[in-house]
């Protein structure tokens, strides 16, 4: 760790976790007995270590059809959603409750967090309460001034891969300011071929200095190609599994027997790239059998166990993918975050992980996968 003073250490009921606010390094012990680490991973934290805070209630990018144009089925239904953004006062209430308990806020919701009317104030509130903010953006409204704010306050920023000039422009603006920049790439049946093209090209050419896209002309020319290049200098590409939620369709879901997906997993398992490769926890059931992936790097669904989502109108959900039906919602106008976290509603959600697939050797690594959209679980075993 570069700066020990930036490392926050939290002692929970029977384990210890630590987070470095500068590097993003996270570590937790196994369950502790008599001061010794048993090696058994704790099931949950006593308070969410990460909160996905939905500060956006509507989306300019989605409203004008740009998500659909890029072939992305927005799980927040940004095409139709027209709710107000979270108020600054509500955000302050959240941050105050999380001070000293939560390491990170993932700013999100239905829209680009950098377009919130109080974006700078929100970042300042995070800093005042010792919480590191991160967020994902389409990049549609990214500016140099916003990129500077990101450098000043954020741990990292992810740009969704929308295959457009503004995608690359946003990435390059962030990189120019020294922001740790990731790409979020939605992995679906219709994007698998393109994902394979990216990885094969970058694996073969990872020592070649690729285009820097210094002008709008370069951007437009690049965007006319079948598959854009990931800009040089990005920290990681994080693959997010497509879910049939909101505008996402079941027809575009990946299945475990998809040959392109199996080839994709082989490539990730066998090769190295000029950037890190990551996945959301929804993909873990498909990753646990990869022999060159360190099992310690895999963490299955953390919803309701380590993290939670807060809607723009202040409902706590175990995961943002419950944003449409809100089956496991708890109203924060009536309960504190701590009370909602310990509620029967959240316990019902967690029971899925405790009781799923009890006889499977991978139970502790997978826990049965997603309780919200079980059809996305990429496992060839039925328990």
Model-derived segments and their meaning:
Residues 257-291, 315-367:
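C-terminal accessory region of radical SAM enzymes
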Residues 1-52, 56, 69-70, 316:
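Flexible, acidic/Gly-rich N-terminal and inter-domain linker regions that tether
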Residues 42-89:
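Canonical Radical SAM [4Fe-4S] cluster-binding loop centered on the CxxxCxxC motif
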Residues 59, 63-74, 351-383:
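Cysteine-cluster motifs in flexible loop/terminal segments that predominantly coordinate metals
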Residues 88-110, 115-241:
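Radical SAM/AdoMet-radical enzyme domain recognition
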